[in-house]
Structure formats: C-alpha cells, structure tokens
Regions:
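A structural signal for short hydrophobic beta-strand segments in well-ordered beta-sheet cores
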Residues: 145-148
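A short core secondary-structure module
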Residues: 159-197
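Short Gly/Pro-enriched turn/cap motifs at secondary-structure boundaries
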Residues: 120, 135-138, 162-165, 177, ...
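Intrinsic disorder at enzyme termini
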Residues: 1-18
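Flexible, small-/acidic-enriched active-site or ligand-binding loops
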Residues: 142, 190-219
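Internal helix-loop-helix
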Residues: 54-126, 164-171
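Short secondary-structure junction/hinge motifs that connect adjacent elements
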Residues: 33-55
C-alpha cells in the first residue's frame, strides 16, 4: 500500500506516474522476494541488472546514446521506488546513471560517449565512480591519487575506498590531482595496474557491492 502523505501524485503527469508504477511493480515482484537473503549473505542480486536495463532505468535523463531522455522528476521517482526495496538497488542505479554516465555525457569526447554510453544504458557495461579515499573521504582537496603526463598519456597512481560497483565495473570514472588541478579520467578496468577488491562484512548496505580500488602506474590515453 502506497501512502502519499504530501499528495505528490497530484503533481505528476501521466508519464511520470506510469514510470513510477512500473518501477514499484518491479520492486515488489523482483526485489522484495530476494533482498533479505542478499542482505544477509552480503550479495548483490546481479541477476536483476539486465532487467533494470530493459526497463530503461540507466541514464534516464540523458537524451540519445540508447538512453530515454526523461525528465529529472522521473529519475527521482525511480530512485524513490528502488529505495523502498533496498538502498543497494537505488545505489546501483544512481551510481551507474548520475556518477558514471552523466559525467561521460557532459564532459566526455564524442568518441567516449559513443563507446561507453550505449553499453552502460544496456548494462553491457557496469561503471563505478572513484572519488572517495580512506584518509580524506570525498573531499577532493584531500585526495592523494595523482596523475602525471607521460607523452600522450597520463600515468595514475593511488587508491580509492568505499566505491560502489567497483569490483564488478567495466569502466571507472577516476578523479586525481594533476599539475593542472583536479581532473577526471575514464579508465577501462582491464587496464594493467588497476585492481579492485570487494569490501566484506559491512554493517550496512550489505546488498550493495562496495570496493577498494588501487592504481599502480595505470596508463590512460589523453
């Protein structure tokens, strides 16, 4: 039973209501039956990733590149309904959409957009966002990860902590200090020197994959 204390539904248009209803139904039918066991076993229900993509829930606010181009209200409603099932489900979708796909869409080259956005939208690829570090949290000014130019490449060294989706990601958006200031890098996780270890035995967000990332002289083309 959905209780709308603030009468939000009266403010929604038909498309927004339809998407909210479809996600609510998905959570009840697919997330609710498995999420307690996933939480207890410290596992993410990876079998639900493709169905999430089939519903069009990745990169919903992006127009083109295999994304539906919906409004921000719909994205908020999607996250709200997923959160009802488990915060790990919402976290998976919001990281994929807001922290990986959107930076690539907003700041990436056309080549990078064409390479990654369709794959991320269809769940052919999973992404993670590397900002937080053990010593400084999510404060960019305290980052120790650094990148230096080497000809036409960048060499990145450092580590990241508490990274959602890190150990299952195919691509990572990594932030690092450079001589020119803080920069973001799109890194294929198969790059030599990139290591991701899953963090075990958390007290919360147990149905979410959380990882520590290590970068040992990883080479990224400009």
């Amino acid at each position: 039973m959905n209780i709308d204390l603030f009468d939000i539904n009266s403010l929604l248009n038909d498309e927004e209501k339809a998407v909210q209803d479809s996600v609510s139904r998905f959570v009840k039918e697919n997330v609710d039956p498995v999420i307690q066991e996933c939480f207890e076993n410290h596992e993410f229900p990876s079998e639900l990733i493709k169905p999430l993509a089939d519903l069009g829930l990745f990169g919903t606010s992006i127009d083109g590149y295999g994304c539906p181009g919906m409004n921000s209200i719909i994205y908020g409603l999607i996250c709200k309904e997923l959160e009802k099932g488990d915060s790990g489900m919402r976290s998976f979708v919001s990281v994929q959409s807001s922290l990986v796909m959107y930076p690539i869409y907003a700041f990436g080259s056309e080549e990078q957009k064409q390479e990654w956005l369709p794959k991320l939208a269809s769940a052919e690829a999973i992404g993670c966002f590397g900002l937080t570090e053990s010593q400084g949290g999510s404060d960019p000014s305290n980052m120790k990860t650094h990148a230096k130019k080497d000809g036409d490449d960048w060499i990145i060294n450092g580590s990241k902590m508490w990274i959602t989706n890190g150990s299952i990601a195919d691509v990572a958006v990594i932030w690092a200090h450079t001589d020119e200031g803080i920069r973001g890098f799109i890194v294929d996780t198969k790059t030599k020197g990139f290591v991701a270890n899953k963090i075990e035995n958390k007290f919360s967000l147990r149905a979410s994959i959380t990882s520590e990332l290590f970068f040992d002289n990883i080479r990224v083309s400009k």
